[in-house]
């Protein structure tokens, strides 16, 4: 009869991240995944509101730290720390920017930007630009994305304009959006714009909606982070590059686990590539010759789920209903009503897949006149009911267990 192994005292580990950002939250989630998939016993210290506060960190009576080194204050506070530390943050073109004495897990900025660039070029956009952040120590990662963007421009022999805009503040918000719209109007069209974060991408969408710039016909927009909260705040679903943040968290936890057992990795750098792109409406660019169709689709994307009719679209565009129908038949081989219905159906499919609402709620929120009408549309277009569609999505995403 074998004895059970003696229980080990858990290691006390501090996680210094600001989980109000999706980037930090997903790194923390990756650390949690590592703990669940191993027999590691860690007592994790985080602030109750998941914010990073450095006061007293020098007196932390623990065994190790995983920290966000994109925050200059964190990097400074941990300089010379006697505990094992794993740094997490941005990749750098200049290798001297990495902390020389620590292992460093980095998001690969060059690959993030390259993936966004390739996606926009593949969508048929001949012009590209970037919307970044003002230069600041805490924004060094954004400047690294600028360098990657400019390098691609030089490699391809094309212009690579960058606009940094203003830092976000309530007092300067209106002015910032106005200046952003001026820059957007100055760009050759059609253009694809890479925003250094989803938050900056939302600014672009706001400016386009306020000033009647068609997305994605005139300006296609892609962000970085795949932040679900940002998606809820935009009328036009935002395409975004998915960072490998959970893998970064797992890798950081794995390194610290080894360090707690005596291993050392001074100066080791591990670059983690992006997972892929969540492609949504903001980059589904289709070259169109008719400005009337561009303007109509811009309006439909915003208001399809609010029960708009063909007459309202024609009024917005400023042409007769019959003329608009003719433009649609030539360009899209469909009617205006069919285009409105397509957007309603796409919205309903997305809501059903998320399982956040009942079928009746989906019908109301997606602008169908009744639940019965939504059922009829699903039957006609997808040959299934909304419930059957929801079940098929759930079954497709369920994990498959291999049999021995």
Language model features with spans:
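Residues within the helices of the helix-turn-helix
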Residues: 311, 337, 360, 376, ...
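A secondary-structure capping/hinge motif
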Residues: 328-335, 377-389
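Intrinsically disordered, low-complexity protein-interaction/activation regions
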Residues: 402-404
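Intrinsically disordered, low-complexity serine/threonine-rich segments
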Residues: 398-400
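Bacterial carbohydrate/catabolite-sensing allosteric modules
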Residues: 1-64, 74-316, 321, 325-326, ...
């Amino acid at each position: 009869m074998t004895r059970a192994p003696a229980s080990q005292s858990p290691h006390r580990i501090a996680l210094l991240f600001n989980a109000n950002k999706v980037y930090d939250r997903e790194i923390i989630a990756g650390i949690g995944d590592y703990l669940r998939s191993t027999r590691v016993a860690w007592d994790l210290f985080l602030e109750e509101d998941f914010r990073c506060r450095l006061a007293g960190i020098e007196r932390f009576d623990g065994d190790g730290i995983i920290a966000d080194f994109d925050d200059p204050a964190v990097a400074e506070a941990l300089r010379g720390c006697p505990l094992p530390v794993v740094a997490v943050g941005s990749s750098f073109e200049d290798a001297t920017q990495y902390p020389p004495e620590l292992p460093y897990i980095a998001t690969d900025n060059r690959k993030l930007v390259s993936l966004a660039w390739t996606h926009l070029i593949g969508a048929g956009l001949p012009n590209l630009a970037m919307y970044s952040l003002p230069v600041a120590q805490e924004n060094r990662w954004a400047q690294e994305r600028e360098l990657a963007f400019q390098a691609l421009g030089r490699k391809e022999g094309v212009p690579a304009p960058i606009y940094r805009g203003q830092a976000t503040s309530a007092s300067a918000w209106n002015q910032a959006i106005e200046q952003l719209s001026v820059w957007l109007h100055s760009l050759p069209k059609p253009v694809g714009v890479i925003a250094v974060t989803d938050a900056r991408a939302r600014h672009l969408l706001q400016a386009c909606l306020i000033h009647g710039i068609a997305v994605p016909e005139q300006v296609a927009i892609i962000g970085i982070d795949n932040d679900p909260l940002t998606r809820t705040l935009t009328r036009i679903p935002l395409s975004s590059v998915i960072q490998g943040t959970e893998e970064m968290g797992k890798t950081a936890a794995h390194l610290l686990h080894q360090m707690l057992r005596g291993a050392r990795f001074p100066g080791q750098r591990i670059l983690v590539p992006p997972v892929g792109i969540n492609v949504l409406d903001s980059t589904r660019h289709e070259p169109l010759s008719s400005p009337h169709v561009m303007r109509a689709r811009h309006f439909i994307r915003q208001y399809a789920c609010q029960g708009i009719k063909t007459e309202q679209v024609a009024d917005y565009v400023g042409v007769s209903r019959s003329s608009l129908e003719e433009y649609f038949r030539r360009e899209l081989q469909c009617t205006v009503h069919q285009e409105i219905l397509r957007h309603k159906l796409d919205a309903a499919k997305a809501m059903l897949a998320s399982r956040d609402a009942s079928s009746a709620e989906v019908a109301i929120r997606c602008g169908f006149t009744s639940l019965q009408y939504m059922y009829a549309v699903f039957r006609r277009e997808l040959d299934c009911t909304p419930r059957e569609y929801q079940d098929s999505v759930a079954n497709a995403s369920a994990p498959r267990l291999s049999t021995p």
